[in-house]
Amino acid sequence: MASSGSGDPLDSKRGEAPFAQRIDPTREKLTPEQLHFMRQAQLAQWQKVLPRRRTRNIVTGLGIGALVLAIHGYTFYSISQERFLDELEDEAKAARARALARASGS
């Protein structure tokens, strides 16, 4: 395999581009310049991804908020329907009582 500084952007045998190796800064001795470069690269990557992440977080928050409002709205609607059904049930009891009174009175 070609060394990292050979100038060949593709590995000619496999046709793949080389990529950065993952290193552990606590185990390997790195110079202050290398550590500074790593921090700069991490910051640049974070700033590049931040707007997309922020947009996704906003969309997720709005979706959850809409779901909460829908649940509350449905709850209020079903409670108002429940009262309506109670009134119908009372009317049905009264109608049954009248029918029973007519049947026993005749």
From Swiss-Prot:
Q: Which residues carry this modification: N-acetylalanine?
A: 2
Annotated Gene Ontology cellular components are: mitochondrial inner membrane
Coiled-coil segments on the chain, per record: 78-104
**Biological process annotations from GO:** mitochondrial cytochrome c oxidase assembly; positive regulation of mitochondrial translation
- Enumerate the Mitochondrial matrix topological stretches: 2-57
Name the UniProt key words of this record, in alphabetical order. Answer: Acetylation, Coiled coil, Membrane, Mitochondrion, Mitochondrion inner membrane, Transmembrane, Transmembrane helix
Membrane-spanning residues where?
58-80
User: What is this entry's stated membrane topology?
Assistant: Single-pass membrane protein
Instruction: Give the chief site where it resides.
Output: mitochondrion
| Region Disordered, residue ranges | 1-28
**Compartments, as annotated in UniProt:** Mitochondrion inner membrane
Q: Which residues lie on this side of the membrane: Mitochondrial intermembrane?
A: 81-106
Q: Which function does this protein serve? A: Core component of the MITRAC (mitochondrial translation regulation assembly intermediate of cytochrome c oxidase complex) complex, that regulates cytochrome c oxidase assembly. MITRAC complexes regulate both translation of mitochondrial encoded components and assembly of nuclear-encoded components imported in mitochondrion. Required for efficient translation of MT-CO1 and mitochondrial respiratory chain complex IV assembly.
Q: How does it assemble?
A: Along with COX14, core component of the MITRAC (mitochondrial translation regulation assembly intermediate of cytochrome c oxidase complex) complex. Interacts with MT-CO1/COX1, SMIM20, SURF1 and TIMM21.
Q: Which family does it belong to?
A: Belongs to the COA3 family.
Name the chain's protein. Cytochrome c oxidase assembly factor 3 homolog, mitochondrial
Q: Which organism is it from?
A: Pongo abelii
Task: Report which gene this protein is encoded by.
Answer: COA3
